[in-house]
Amino acid sequence: MDDKKDNRHLSKPAYREECTGDTERSTTAYMDILEDVSTGSTSKLPLEAKFVKISNNISEKENLPKEKEIGGVKGLEPTRYGDWQHKGKVTDF
């Protein structure tokens, strides 16, 4: 690879934060400062990103018991016909 830093992840605005004011003091919490010479904007990258681990294990979800609706319709759901009835009042979707 060449000496240029790989900044493909900065193409989305959600990953980019503009620097304003005195950048010397505001850069202490950031690892890399990237400056786009053509536009003059500066982007900051955080020291570490925190990711939440999402379980993709489907078997855990399948073993959970289904919760029954309290006060719900007995039998088949009326939504399969495109309407809902509650205490004699019908609502169409």
UniProtKB/Swiss-Prot annotation:
It holds the Pfam family DUF1674. Residues 1-24 are annotated as: Disordered. It comes from the Bacteria. Residues 8-55 form the RPE1 insert domain. InterPro entries: RPE1, SDHF4. Belongs to the SDHAF4 family. NCBIfam families: RPE1. This is UPF0369 protein RC0209. The lineage of its organism: Bacteria, Pseudomonadati, Pseudomonadota, Alphaproteobacteria, Rickettsiales.
